[in-house]
Amino acid sequence: MTPACPGCGLKLAHVDGIAPENYAASPACWATYGELTAYNMQRADPGFLHQLAVDAYAAQHDGPSSKAIATAFGLIGLYLTFEQGFNGREVQHAHAVLAGSRHDWPRLAAPPSRGAMTVADVMAALEGDERDDRLREWARQVWLAWSEQHAIVAGWLPDPQRLKRPSRWGPAHS
């Protein structure tokens, strides 16, 4: 076993490689996230559920070397999904709009625990609906773990619905 992942606490067998320094992640955790990414990309989900994985991973793996924008956008994506009903494509569009609007995203104090579930819990679920549901639950736990920061995140977006492009992708997948 390798040491626990600094972001989520996941303990997996050693994996050669490194995790990007802008995430507080172990190589094994990062490799598992890569497996989830590959799985999600081959599914071609029109609502782009994978955006929820991107945002949950960024928020759960915030660390001293993380870029403030990565954690902020992770939390914004979770807020837009769980509090505003956006699907992944709509969150992706909101991120694109917000990226050009501000350059000084603040660093928030991370909670001591960022959810009991990890990306490995998502990958342990059966492929298909069960894994999708597990991904949503993981992301929801990460969002709830940051509850002390919810008002700040909501304050960054005084009119979140203006960020919602008319959907061509069907109903939200949250």
Residue ranges and their predicted role:
Residues 1-174:
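Intrinsically disordered, low-complexity linkers and terminal regions
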